[in-house]
């Protein structure tokens, strides 16, 4: 097999089989910065909100480029324990952050990886994604519990119900 493709008998089977181009190389790849869990109904949420469990919110991060304009705000986030790590864009060095710590060399060019917080925008989808409404953006509301919480009024586009359906949440990194 050359370049990651399985050896196929004919051109047609190289596209349609389980190890073919589409199913083997383009569909169903693992990605970072996402979560998958069961959904439950939460009518107290706004229709454009998704309830994200605290455990997931303390795992997934949003990159914040440090500039001369937001340097003080990023330092406050680090001191409050809301930043997982700093990444130096120039060297790629990763500096873990702890609550109460204030980095001495925080300067423009660093990227702070902040934990999810209320108001962040995430992309939610339920497979199979058959049409464009099966994947939509929602605002985060961090909630207690272990399941993603969704307003019952916005289940129709996802063809979802609350009988054990799982949904995927992706955190944009730009």
Regions found by a protein language model. Give the residues of each.
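Core mixed alpha/beta domains of very large multi-subunit molecular machines
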Residues: 1-174
